[in-house]
Amino acid sequence: DIEEIKLTNVGYSFKDKEIFKNINCSFEKGKNYAIVGESGSGKSTLINIILGNNKQYSGSVKYNDVEISDIEESQLFKSVSYIGNITHIYHDSLRNNLTLWDNKINESEIINILKQVNLIDLIPRLDDEVSMSFLSEGQKQRLGIARAYLTKTNVIIMDESMANLDRDNAFLIENQLLNDPTRMYITVSHHLQEKLLDRFHSIITL
């Protein structure tokens, strides 16, 4: 499990323009974090640095005291679930879209997760093939969140992942994530729901 992700003096510039500098923070297992800021402030860039996708930064990023550059990408992929605002849908069954062909995930787990993300209507259609018109944008986004739950990683990073959800579904899902003591939860958002603000251990403003 990832117990801590630590950023020390992290900075990033693009075409000689400084986007941010001297970011110092720690993300710990069982705690909730939000990264906020105006468009262009570098929120998604910071997430890509944390995920190991962007290597053009200054400073240090460590997972459990190991520099991210020393960690195999495949290991990072197994340790962290990332959910963006677009969920990739495979031309396969709904079940395989949720489990990513992991046969160790059983039916009851899938049903439980679909209930958590308010996709109960899809339970009878688990073995139906998914087409582009099969799901609404909001359903696709909730499918992506369900997929992340099912991977059982203890780090969940969401980048504007609630953008296509109505307020009630967004609240339902975020409330569950904020209540989960087994995971480190990091969200990037333009708009945090006010009634959930006190549930974040730290809010990082860029």
Feature names for model-found ranges:
Residues G59-E67, L76:
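Conserved ABC transporter NBD signature motif
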Residues I5, F20-N22:
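Conserved structural motif at the start of ABC-family nucleotide-binding domains
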Residues I156-E160:
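Catalytic Walker B motif of ABC-type/P-loop ATPase nucleotide-binding domains
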Residues L119-L143, R147, K152-N154:
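ABC-fold ATPase nucleotide-binding domain signature/coupling loops
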Residues V36-E38:
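The feature captures the beta-strand-to-loop junction immediately N-terminal to the Walker
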Residues T87-S131:
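Conserved "ABC signature" C-loop
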Residues L51:
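Helix-to-loop junction immediately C-terminal to a conserved catalytic motif
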